[in-house]
């Protein structure tokens, strides 16, 4: 399968997910949040474009995964997964991926506000300029530096005094206007001054910074940013539930196909998770759904006109299986 076919396949998967939720919500989402996150895919052979990554301390690929969240729903729906070389910067491919998602989402949800959440590896002037030109909200992590450390110094002092007085972890918030030397203009930086205290340990300073164009209070902005942490659970499901890291083919494009097949399977499982509300599998992760609903002994009967699957008449999760089968369109 060549590059064009793989690109088309990736676009179709994203379009399918977005169209599915357009029908579910009737195009009435108020806000759609896009999360991007890279993840390491360790390699153990001579695959094309596998490189050593110092951050993860291993030879790997570095795929990037995108999810969308509608309004205040807890679910993050996977829409895109792109395989990248192991030494790729976090932001490689991000602008093209976001550009297409913006176009597709706006066509499906014309009145929705788009919001992007990213970690500090993506922070750069080209990214901020792109997001501002696209007219979207953004909350992006920002690595600390000498200048930002000076801006947060007073807050950190106050947090240390509070932590000492209470004997517990202390957090204080503030904001400032800041521009790095490579930035075209100043932007709002939300600061969190945190002093972490654990019994028997020396208190630890934990300053954090977030770049945003939102007008919300600093605590509210930082709370929005922290919600992206649930993305780690999506990555764990892809890795441990569906083995997205089985990219052992020697050719890079073949491994991209494997990643897309894993994404397609995950999209199906996420739909099962959504349809499982009201059952014992309502909060089940992919691994549990596989064990309870997919790993069944089936007798296959084939005739000239049809193929019949004879399922077991009794097994522990029969009622849940029937509920989900009917929810996705099966008839008895």
Place the predicted regions along the sequence by residue.
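Domain-level cores of phosphate- or acyl-group-handling catalytic modules
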Residues: 88-147
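Electropositive, glycine- and tryptophan-enriched low-complexity nucleic-acid-binding patches
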Residues: 54-109
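A short, flexible helix-boundary coil/loop motif
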Residues: 265-332
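Short acidic, glycine/serine/threonine-rich loops at helix termini
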Residues: 43-50, 78-80, 125-131, 150-155
């Amino acid at each position: 399968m060549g590059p064009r076919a793989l690109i088309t396949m990736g676009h179709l998967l994203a379009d399918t997910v977005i169209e599915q939720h357009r029908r579910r919500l009737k195009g009435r989402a108020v806000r759609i949040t896009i999360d991007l996150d890279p993840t390491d895919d360790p390699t153990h052979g001579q695959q094309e474009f596998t490189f050593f990554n110092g951050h993860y301390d291993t030879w790997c690929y570095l795929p990037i995964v995108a999810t969308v969240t509608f309004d205040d729903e807890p679910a993050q729906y996977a829409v895109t997964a792109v395989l990248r070389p192991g030494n790729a910067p976090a932001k490689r491919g991000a602008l093209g991926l976001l550009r297409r998602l913006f176009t597709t989402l706006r066509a499906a949800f014309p009145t929705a506000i788009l919001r992007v959440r990213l970690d500090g590896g993506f922070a750069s002037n080209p990214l901020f300029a792109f997001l501002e030109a696209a007219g979207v909200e953004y909350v992006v992590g920002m690595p600390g530096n000498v200048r930002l450390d000076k801006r947060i110094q007073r807050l950190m002092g106050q947090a240390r005094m509070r932590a000492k007085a209470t004997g517990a972890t202390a957090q204080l918030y503030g904001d400032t206007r800041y521009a790095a030397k490579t930035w075209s203009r100043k932007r709002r930086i939300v600061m969190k001054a945190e002093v972490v205290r654990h019994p028997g340990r020396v208190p630890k300073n934990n300053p954090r910074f977030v770049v945003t164009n939102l007008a919300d209070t600093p605590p509210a902005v930082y709370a929005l940013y922290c919600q992206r942490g649930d993305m780690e659970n999506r990555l764990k499901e892809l890795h441990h539930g569906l083995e997205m890291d089985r990219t052992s083919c020697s050719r890079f494009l073949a491994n991209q196909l494997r990643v897309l097949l894993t994404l397609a399977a995950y999209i199906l499982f996420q739909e099962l998770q959504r349809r499982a509300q009201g059952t014992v599998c309502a909060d089940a992760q992919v691994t549990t759904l596989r064990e309870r609903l997919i790993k069944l002994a089936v007798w296959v009967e084939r005739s000239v006109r049809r193929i019949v699957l004879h399922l077991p008449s009794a097994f522990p999760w029969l009622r849940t299986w029937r509920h989900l089968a009917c929810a996705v369109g099966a008839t008895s």
